Design a protein with these regions (language model features):
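Catalytic machinery of carbohydrate-active enzymes
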Residues: 1-235
Length: 235
């Protein structure tokens, strides 16, 4: 806020805590009772934008992305009759990661029910995915590190469900209107949750109140993640 105030722009606007409102020409107060996306849309309303209707996050893969995804599925011998469930087990914030062995157990359960399971994620997730799949009794498809955002969106569109941590790829799945099951621990799903009706949010029961005043980036306990059970996710 201070740096912005030092610039010579004619109009400064944004959303932040009220103690910083003096740095803005048009100020939208931070409201943690509403979703962050709606809060940012309020900034536009303060600027006079009348039509705030939206379809949520949308990513539009190009033809090359659909071709990339289709070639990948062909290489994995996936047909139109196969039912795919995707898994995204990574997150840039370590405290948001559900244990890999539980993802493995969930994947095995769905594989036993006739689904093909596929693990997504970026290059940074490859070690985690290797650990998770090492626990599995069935053989999944590994797409980790294979796709950039456009290809990932096209590939995720082929899935009937994505099971995911709170992460960037979760929002990519949402952008393709794929139903998701999302695990939420230290971050507040009311503020940062999936911006879609096609989502089931799983939280620890009973919930941990350790991050009531803000998300922790390190924690010696992580009850918010470890209390979430395989049964909750599968259900």
């Amino acid at each position: 806020s201070f740096i912005d105030a030092m610039t010579s722009v004619k109009l400064r606007t944004g959303t932040t805590h009220k103690i910083f409102k003096w740095f803005w020409d048009v100020f939208t107060p931070l409201d943690r009772s509403m979703h962050a996306a709606d809060m940012y849309l309020d900034v536009l309303q303060q600027l006079g934008v009348q039509d705030l209707s939206n379809n949520g996050l949308e990513i539009f893969p190009g033809e090359e992305h659909f071709l990339e995804a289709e070639l990948f599925w062909q290489e994995q011998n996936i047909t139109d009759q196969d039912k795919l469930i995707g898994f995204n087990i990574g997150s840039a914030v370590p405290t948001k990661r559900w244990p890999p062995e539980r993802f493995a157990e969930v994947a095995d359960i769905f594989a036993a029910r006739g689904y093909k399971t596929v693990f997504f994620g970026g290059p940074m997730d490859e070690e985690m995915v290797a650990e998770a799949t090492g626990y599995m009794q069935t053989r999944p498809i590994i797409a980790t590190g294979h796709f950039a955002i456009g290809g990932l969106a096209a590939a995720m569109r082929r899935c009937c469900l994505i099971i995911t941590n709170d992460s960037g790829p979760m929002h990519v799945a949402i952008s393709q209107k794929v139903p998701i099951v999302a695990m939420y621990g230290p971050s507040n799903p009311k503020l940062y949750g999936p911006y879609t009706k096609e989502a089931v949010i799983v939280t620890a029961q009973p919930p941990c109140q350790g991050c009531a005043d803000g998300m922790k980036h390190s924690c010696d306990d992580l009850q918010c993640m470890t209390r979430m059970t395989v049964e909750q996710v599968v259900k």
